[in-house]
Amino acid sequence: MRKTFIIIAGAALALAAVSCEKTLDEQVIDIAPETRALTKAGGNNWITALPDNAYASQLSIPGTHDAATGDGTTFSLGKTQSLTLQEQWNMGIRVFDLRPGYKKVRKGLFKYVNELHIYHGIVETRTSFKAAVKVLSDNLAANPGEFAIILMRFENDSPLYNKRDVWNSLMSSFLTSSDFPAERRIDFRPDLTVGELRGKILVLSRDAYASAPSTGAFVSGWSHSVDGTTNAVISGRNASATLQLQDYYSVENKEAKIASIKNYVDIASAAEPGVWTINHTSGYTGTIGSDSSIKQNAENNNVALYDYLTDSSRPCGSTGIILLDHAGVRSSGSYDIYGDLLPQAIIDNNFAFQLRLKGE
């Protein structure tokens, strides 16, 4: 038997609806954008309320693209976030796109060692991979009903620190060290449930650092095409799953990007348990990821997806994982980004349709 959950005024109530019905203050009226009703932001600890036997693949999870850039970067080019990792966690973000490369760090008068550090392309953030993992681990210790997902890849654009064998060794050692506590590790399976993931950090690495993942899984078949792919693979040590994904980030055609985002929401809604979906509103317009082109893209896509998710006529279902830029930012200068409203609309979606439950 399937169960339905919806949060209204902080309580879990049954909802027997097929369409995505909204409460009165969440309905979107087809009038001028500046006067339409908006969902309320404030989504921390939303996973705690979900049933243990809900399939993780069926959840709607907000995530941040190049999440650590909000903690500070060496310069503004490539800065995709405005909030720190802690602030992102506080608003309900649970998927964090982290791009660890490595650099030499001074440990003594004449001693330097290589350490994992987070970059976006050639842009260095002010956050080490160790520090980023600690933020998530500390929050899980304080909120054991939650879980986090790290989506990572080797950011090797630095001309000085781009040796894959060095990165492989550093990452293999880190993921089996006390800096990544054993109680946070979990092997990937397609049918992982919320209960199994509580208190864990699921690591999905787009680059293989060893012959088999130390924890989590490897992701292969990534695509940056406008059409995305439904044939990528998430491979754990003992099981693998189909991954459906859209990451068209160098956006030459705004309408095509929006159509692809919506298409992958629909694909996620129709997916069977065990099939995972990762969808990106993130990217930039034009040919370079400048501050203005990233924010323009966020305005284009975040608002369009927000409107789509809060349309009461849309059939309900999972959105999968959705990564966005400038989470938590309603507007910046002349750009209406909806970075606070879209994550909450994604979170709300978990409580507006019949979750598929393992064993029922």
Task: Name these PLM-found stretches.
Residues 1-27:
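Bacterial Sec-dependent N-terminal signal peptides
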Residues 57-62, 94-101, 147-152, 201-205, ...:
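Structural recognition of the beta-strand scaffold that forms the well-ordered cores
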Residues 65, 156, 207-209:
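Short, flexible active-site-adjacent loop segments at beta-strand->alpha-helix junctions, enriched
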Residues 85-86, 136-137, 168, 172, ...:
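Short amphipathic alpha-helical segments and helix-helix/interface helices
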Residues 100-103, 114-180:
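Metal-dependent phosphodiesterase/phospholipase catalytic core, i.e.
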Residues 162-174, 214-223, 334-348:
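Short, aromatic/basic amphipathic alpha-helical patches
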Residues 177-316:
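Surface-exposed substrate-engagement region within the catalytic domains
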